[in-house]
């Protein structure tokens, strides 16, 4: 059986690092190694990680301060590339410092790669049932996060992704020119070389603990990054059209309310068509929050993707001010 290395990056994740490391060490069968790159933490994360590595030979801790915005436009990508370069196994599984993982996650995610039947696998993400906010539930589908571990997914996220080291080398690694959305760009390139294996039972358990403000800020940052990278034009056009329809309906209210009714029905479909079967279990407050967030999304995407396209200024990362983001 081919060995597998798990890699992750972190910066100022003292509140989460123990949970993620313990869940990765509990994988059955165990990984050959777990390589974690610290980008220069100042909150005690590095001290915890290095002490844990001194007790656990499978845990490889690397401190590389070039994997931060002080030195790199894309610190998360750089951290992953550093970790993968250091990893000794021919198969790489990506994990995330803001997630935890079931004991069979690694086995399920890499099964077809280990068997030689795939080069690239995607497991997806679902909300951690042990801790979430109403805005986590409301914003989930807009960040490719599922509400249930049994919900099918075909989304790409480096929270649960595996590939051969050879594929990573052919692609040229994770793109270091963007702060966020780097896994999407990696996925675009990977699909030029191979077809992904979608694994339904290998989801990362994610606990973002969002407020409306933090969820909106994250959506804004992803849109700016898409604009800077020049990707997802169809999403920009779709969301711009929704903005135009909303404005037209409001302007027409003094004469007729039919356009407003049409927009209401359209936005209801956008808000709930993906996962209402799971969403309604979270209660009426979550349903209302989902509708509210969905109405705001086209404005966040359209305005900020255009802004990103015409801005050369790199995004800022609040990890550099001492707050973790689970990335």
Where on the chain are the PLM-derived regions?
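Short aromatic/hydrophobic "clamp" motif used to bind/position activated sugar donors
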Residues: 92
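N-proximal low-complexity "stem/linker" segments adjacent to membrane-targeting elements
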Residues: 1-23
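Catalytic donor/gating beta->alpha subdomain of glycosyltransferases that bind UDP-sugars
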Residues: 175-234
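A recurrent flexible, glycine/aromatic-enriched loop bordering the glycosyltransferase active site
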Residues: 128, 145-166, 179, 204, ...
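Conserved donor NDP-sugar-binding/catalytic core segment of glycosyltransferases
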Residues: 100, 104-134, 207
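Glycine-rich, basic loop-to-helix element that forms the pyrophosphate-binding segment
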Residues: 66-87
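Short, acidic, metal-binding catalytic loop of nucleotide-sugar glycosyltransferases
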Residues: 22-31
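A conserved acidic beta->alpha catalytic loop
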Residues: 38-47, 66, 99
